[in-house]
Every structure is written in C-alpha cells, then in structure tokens.
C-alpha cells in the first residue's frame, strides 16, 4: 500500500502539469459565437448563440462548466488528495519547521536514495520522527486515493 502511494506521489508533478495545460487550454479557447446588431438608440449589442452539445452561448459560463468537468476527472481528484496530504504534514509544528519538513518529505519521496534524512538537514526533527511522519503522509495519500 505504501509503495503504491509512493508511486502516486512521484506522479504528482506530471498530474499538475497536465492539469495546468488543460486549464490553459480551456481559458485560452475562443469565445462563443454571437450575432452583433445595432439597437434603436444606435448602441451595438451582442446576442450569444447556443453552442453545440447543449453548451450555453455565454463564453464565461462555458469555461466554468469545462473547469467544473475537469475537476471531476480522476487524475485531478488524485492530485487534490496528494496536495491535501502535503498540507497536513507537520500541523503541530511551527510554520518554518513545517515548511522545511514538507520540502524534505517531498524530496525524499521523489528520490529516497538521493535525498536521505542525513542530506536533507531537517532541524529539530529526529530521524525516526522524520520517517514516521513520512509514513503517515504516505498512509494519508493511500487513504485519500482509496488504496486501503
């Protein structure tokens, strides 16, 4: 279970890149089709035409719907669970120490041979405490992703 959670954590940068690309694609997409006309007072106005597949003619609403649909995808849910688990690391510690611990656990999970406890220099946290917190983080990821 922890090994599967470790692979999920190692895939986090790829999921985040994929998510950012999808959001950029949605936000950068062209607007909806519209018809422009002149009102009696000489003011110009637009009427947005309904899009294909039942989408609204409002470009902002269409983009919101697309982002909502994106948030319901499996890889985005997994990405969110891992982010929540990272935020939960070291909740009982002062902020600076908590950030150092989050960074250290992140690096250790990415490459445990290169970033061992001794090389990470996490002040105020002992070796056994570090690995206990790392295991708790991976268990949190596993639980959040439904591996148990």
Residue ranges and their predicted role:
Residues 78-82, 101, 133:
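Amphipathic alpha-helical interface surfaces
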Residues 1-96, 147:
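N-terminal interaction/assembly modules
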Residues 85, 108-111, 140, 144:
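Mid-sequence acidic-hydrophobic segments that form the walls
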Residues 111-128:
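Helix-turn-helix DNA-binding module
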Residues 130-144:
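DNA major-groove recognition helices of helix-turn-helix
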Residues 94-115:
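Short amphipathic alpha helix immediately N-terminal
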């Amino acid at each position: 279970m922890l090994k599967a959670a470790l692979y999920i954590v190692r895939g986090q940068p790829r999921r985040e890149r994929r998510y950012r690309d999808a959001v950029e694609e949605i936000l950068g997409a062209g607007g909806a089709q519209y018809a422009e006309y002149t009102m009696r007072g000489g003011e110009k106005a637009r009427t947005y035409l309904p899009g294909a597949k039942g989408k609204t003619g409002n470009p902002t609403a269409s983009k919101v719907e697309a982002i909502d649909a994106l948030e319901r995808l499996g890889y985005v849910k997994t990405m969110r669970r891992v982010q929540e688990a990272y935020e939960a690391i070291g909740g009982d510690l002062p902020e600076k120490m908590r950030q150092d611990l989050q960074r250290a656990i992140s690096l250790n999970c990415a490459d445990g041979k290169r970033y061992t406890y001794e090389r990470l220099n996490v002040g105020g946290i002992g070796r056994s405490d570090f690995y206990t917190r790392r295991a708790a983080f991976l268990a949190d990821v596993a639980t959040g992703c439904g591996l148990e």
